[in-house]
Every structure is written in structure tokens, then in C-alpha cells.
Amino acid sequence: MTRPRVKSYFIDYSLKKVMLDEFLANYFKDAGYAGMELYKTPTGYRVVIYAEYPGRIIGRGGSIIRKLMTIMQTHFGLENVNITVSPVPDPDLNARIVAFRIVRALEKEIPYRRVAMAMLRRVMEAGAVGAEIIISGKLRSERARYEKLKAGRIYKAGDMVDYVVDRAVGKALLKRGVYGVEVVIVRPHLKPPDYVEIKSVKPEELADLIPVEKEETNESISPQ
């Protein structure tokens, strides 16, 4: 009898988390929203919001936070919610922040290729292993197409996708229509599975590793 309740609990919890994440992404797009975490505590819920500009989410004197707490209680059913806003340590390595930057630039009628090249260069200068930016829509004509720019190494499958690859999508509303933006960033990591390191050996170390063959000398035997 308890299994259906446990299953429905986790389904409701996941749906609530996804809906809250989409709401915060649309509401705080200009604040550099980077993601959120939802925790269940003994007294209620705890929400941690990550953003590039935390002050735009907190508001003057916490006014926006208080409104946000009311919205979470009435529309999402989060009773006794505690909200924490944390800054992002590396905004240039966060795919969602980069995608929102591209969206804001496109909505200002900045050429898409210039925006993509500038953001790609900025991500790689921040230390990313690889990055890929895809912009789709009516870019040059009435027919929809896409433009893909990438640099470095991109992982499409395997365990590395779950650990070091960050992906985000966004959409920009223009007069010509809707532009889709997809950003993939491979964050810096220690060693990938296909990493091969060739060590340099000093000459004196090489002499110790390779045995030196001694030349045999033929001693002449003098007759008695």
C-alpha cells in the first residue's frame, strides 16, 4: 500500500521542481538566472536560487523575495519556504547564463554571428574544454535554417556528458520570428577518459633506463 504513495510523492516532487525552474527562468531572465535546487526540510521547503546578479532577485530590502515566497506558497504549494540566493562562481561557464546573454543580444537586433562569436570566445577564454552554440530560425531569408559554431572538444555521449557537459536552450522573440538558441559547454575537468599524457624524459634518466652494452676486448695471448 505504501509503494504507490512513495511513487506519487516523487513524481509530484519532480513536477513541482520542473515547473518552479521554468517559472524562475522566465521571471528572472534579466537577472542571469542559472538554476535552482529544491530541498524538503522537516519544517517546510528550502529553495536555493543561483544567479549572475543576486541583487536583482532579492530586491530592495528583500521586496522581491517576499513576493516570490507568496507566489511559491499559493501557486506551487510550498509551505514555510526559505529562499536563498547565491551567486554563480563562473558565469561564463554556465550554459544557461550564456544562452540568456545571447537571447538578450538578439532581441536588441545585434547580428547573430557577431553575438555567437563573441560569446564563444568568451567561454573558451574562461577555461572551457569545448563549447558549441547553435542559433536557428529565419536568419537570412524566409526559410528557417541554423548556424552552428563550436570550439574545442565536445562530448556527445558517455559518462562525461553527465558530469562535465552543461546544456541550455533559450528563445528570442524578434520581428522576423522566434530564434532558438542552444548552448553546450564542456566545463574544465581533471582528465577525460581518452586523455593520453606523454612524459618527457631527461637524458640522465634515459641513460639509467637503457642498459649500456660493454664492448668485448680480445686479449692477445703471448706464446710461452
Curated annotation (Swiss-Prot):
KH type-2 domain span: 20-89
SUPFAM superfamilies: Prokaryotic type KH domain (KH-domain type II), Ribosomal protein S3 C-terminal domain
Cellular component, GO annotation: cytosolic small ribosomal subunit
Signal peptide location: none
This protein's UniProt keywords: Ribonucleoprotein, Ribosomal protein, RNA-binding, rRNA-binding
One of the protein's GO biological processes: translation
UniProt-listed SMART domains: KH
InterPro entries: KH_dom (IPR004087), KH_dom-like_a/b (IPR015946), KH_dom_type_2 (IPR004044), KH_sf_prok-type (IPR009019), Ribosomal_S3_C_sf (IPR036419), Ribosomal_uS3_arc (IPR027488), Ribosomal_uS3_C (IPR001351), Ribosomal_uS3_euk/arc (IPR005703)
GO molecular function: rRNA binding; structural constituent of ribosome
One Pfam family recorded for the sequence: Ribosomal_S3_C
Superkingdom to which the source organism belongs: Archaea
Function recorded in the entry: Binds the lower part of the 30S subunit head.
HAMAP family, per the entry: Ribosomal_uS3_A
Assembly: Part of the 30S ribosomal subunit.
Family: Belongs to the universal ribosomal protein uS3 family.
The protein's name: Small ribosomal subunit protein uS3
